Amino acid sequence: MPPFARPSRVLRAVVLGDLALDVVLAPARLLERGTDVPGVVRLHQGGSAASTARWLARLGVRTTLVCAVGRDGPGRALVAALRNDGVRVRAARPAGSRTGRIGLLVDAAGERSFVADRGAADLLSSDDLRPGWFRGAGVLHLPAYSLLGSPLGGATARGIALAREAGARISVDLASAEPLLAIGRRSAHRLISDASPDLLFTNTDEAAAFLGTVDPAGLATFAPVVIVKGGAAGATLLVRGDGGPALRLEVATRPIAAADTTGAGDAFDAGFLAEWLVRDRATTLAVLHRAAAAGHRVAARQLGRPRRELRLP
């Protein structure tokens, strides 16, 4: 079964956010203080925005990634790898900066802990953006940390305005709770409200941290369609109607054993968005169910394949 319906026209998307070098540490056993343990160290293309863009391109969506990288070997290698996957990369290269690096420690269950050195990824400015990049796009997708800080937050605000002017919908993934909560829950809520997303993606842990409760129902105040990713437990969709509480839709998935879950959430977003674009961005329960099912299938593809090693020059 294909991951989503075959489009009868060109589908376009813009993703704005991080392209970074993932340095993955997968120890064969528990770390021991003051000594070394055997394991595997790998270099991969990273960044939530870049991973979503790559999957969108693989699924047949004409995709542009707007990002910033350093004027260095990792930046050149990352841009080249994404272009090889069919992504149109519009990368600013701020002087004196280095490409972002993310350290990932992967445990035996495949779960990850991160150390983020975002570097150039946070230095995209509004002057770097061009209106033509957004023309014809059906959706602008971004991880929530693209809304944070300066100059990146200003660039993202301009990107949202340009996308709206071009007729695109806005899709936001909370992506990571810690950067949002670092500014305080009230400020984080205001940031998402100001972005006014049409679609809001999150996982169960991020939703609980963002709201301060395990019940995700409150997310429906931030977007008309909310997608809560629960991993092997499936996805919960909250869909606002005409008054009254949001409708709740559960979409099951098949559990998959994975040594590394990196990128599964980004792949889900891409699968969902691709199917949603094919279905003319409709928000009926039937279309949203199809989109979530497509997201599950693409996430399974991400989990079922080894991540490709990045070759540095």
Could you say what each language-model-derived stretch is?
Residues 1-68, 73-80, 84, 102, ...:
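Glycine-rich phosphate/adenosyl-contacting loop at the front of the ribokinase-like
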Residues 2-14, 162-165, 212-313:
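Conserved phosphate-binding/catalytic region of the ribokinase-like
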Residues 13-15, 170, 200-201, 226:
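Residue-level marker for buried hydrophobic side chains located in beta-strands
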Residues 33-35, 43, 58-142:
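Conserved N-terminal subdomain of the carbohydrate kinase-like
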Residues 56, 203, 265:
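Short, conserved phosphate/pyrophosphate- and ester-handling motifs at nucleotide-, phospho-/glycolipid
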Residues 63, 89, 170-171, 226:
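Hydrophobic beta-strand scaffold residues
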Residues 135-136, 196, 222:
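Alpha-helix C-terminal capping/helix-to-coil transition sites in glycosyltransferase folds
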Residues 139-217, 233-235, 240-241:
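Conserved beta-alpha-beta core of the PfkB/ribokinase-like small-molecule kinase fold
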